[in-house]
């Protein structure tokens, strides 16, 4: 083991533990300009900076009741420097509510040479300098998304290794510059595979990821894991939440060290309600679970809100109420106490799956 110790060592551990506070989770609001444009177009709103700012202000200035269910918000670079209509930086709004600002630092995926359409994530060049700039701007954690797919021969060992080591290099660079790295090896739900295949692939990918993190001397106590839940493929028959929970927790038990403070699941195209119900089932599983099991949801926290808002100022209160409903549901799910929604809002049961999803 290396004798290297980041000057941010204690701060990293404290911030990772804070983000993993039981009952709280992360709002992923780090969509690229192109991706948020697709969200806005779905409600017939033009993708211009003023509308993106208005949506983010709606999200970040929701009532304190909403913010009490969050410990972190992941921002896109544009958003890190944006302000409310009254001129207050979003970073200050979040900090005053006790919510840590985070930042997406990867530059998207590119095809991995020598594979059948598999990808690797770019963005390591200049990452240290960017992390220092983001830390100075108020960010305290970061996100990097690696993407793997399940197929007849995928993911290949080459793809698993390349993505695991990319995540590890990103993680140690973040820690050297004061940012808690969220490690996100997402296995896409695309395909007709059953849950057993997803479980086996998830275990392989997570095992390789933690081997790489160890090789790079990453401080695990100062990291978070953002994995997929273990589910059947999008074209396969669905299974009960209890089955998803059993396979998901087992995969984590077999691969994720107890030193990791929290696992914050991605929603992976599940509907808002489906993601909450499955997270609740995961937290109801008995047995060894040394990590907080929480959420880092984007689409699965925002869909009802978008529908309620529709780009209209007069709908902001209704949209924030919808956001509060989903945030409260997911907070309860992290504690295993969510009872399900008796009256689902518009969009809450709508599948959010997009094939070959790009953030």
Curated annotation (Swiss-Prot):
GO terms for cellular component: cytoplasm. SUPFAM superfamilies: Aldolase (SSF51569). It is an enzyme of class 4 (lyase). One of its GO terms (molecular function) is fructose-bisphosphate aldolase activity. Its EC number is 4.1.2.13. The record marks 359 as: Necessary for preference for fructose 1,6-bisphosphate over fructose 1-phosphate. GO terms for biological process: glycolytic process. It catalyses: beta-D-fructose 1,6-bisphosphate = D-glyceraldehyde 3-phosphate + dihydroxyacetone phosphate. Substrate binds at residues 52, 143. Keywords: Cytoplasm, Glycolysis, Lyase, Schiff base. It is found in: Cytoplasm. The active site is at residues 184, 226. PROSITE patterns: ALDOLASE_CLASS_I. Pathway: Carbohydrate degradation; glycolysis; D-glyceraldehyde 3-phosphate and glycerone phosphate from D-glucose: step 4/4. NCBIfam families: FrucBisAld_I (NF033379). Belongs to the class I fructose-bisphosphate aldolase family. This is Fructose-bisphosphate aldolase, cytoplasmic isozyme 2.
